[in-house]
């Protein structure tokens, strides 16, 4: 892999400290075109894990989907053959990277719904520290069209928050897990938290830890906002079907305690020793 894709010690340190880091100009035009084409195809003919939300005031529309890489060759190539697995290896300091799944978030103009504050890993049937997401937008991101917001350093709180539906009609209720906590009312007390967000351009990436608390505002602009995320895991992450995890992300090949290596969670990067 070219040295052009070696992340600086400063970038890795920011990720480890804050739980999120912005990577500028990392997705080239070829990959952006592939993402755009696949997203448009999914909007026209959604894949099997499509989900929509009831929007506020009856305006706008939210189009969501996941595990798209299993159905679109271009997205499979992006998830496996782009620089993302290599970035994950560096940020997680892992000698092995598995693809977990990918996810699409399209907010049409005037979709005012927030994506509620949450951390991701309680929704997922996996356990272990080295878990990361890379989120990119195919449209410029500003405060008007729903930027991602993060609470700095919240991945180190040691908190697993009970999964909840993101909007009415989004999905069935999540099972209650007695080991998880109810998330506090962050939105009504924003001044008590160290909240950060980022303006972005197409080609930029947000890398964030699976336990960092985050959400996003609605899209009050007149333009579409197309967000796409890919999730990866590092070494020693195991499969776990405790209450609360999303049923559509579970893997029939595995049993609790297994390493993730499987058709659904393939190994996409491997090296004989730790990257750093």
Pin down the residues of each PLM region.
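Generic beta-strand structural signal
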Residues: 95-97, 101-102, 113-115, 130-136, ...
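Non-heme Fe(II)-dependent double-stranded beta-helix
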Residues: 1-18, 24-117, 122-125, 243, ...
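Short, conserved beta-strand element in jelly-roll/cupin
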Residues: 125-143, 199, 207, 231-234
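Short, charged/polar surface micro-motifs in flexible loops or helix N-caps
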Residues: 84, 94, 109-111, 141-143, ...
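Double-stranded beta-helix
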Residues: 143-213
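Active-site region of the double-stranded beta-helix
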Residues: 95-97, 121, 136-147, 153-156
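A short beta-loop-beta micro-motif enriched in histidine and acidic residues
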Residues: 119-131, 193-194, 200, 223-224
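Non-heme Fe(II)/2-oxoglutarate
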Residues: 45-57, 165-166, 202-207, 211-276
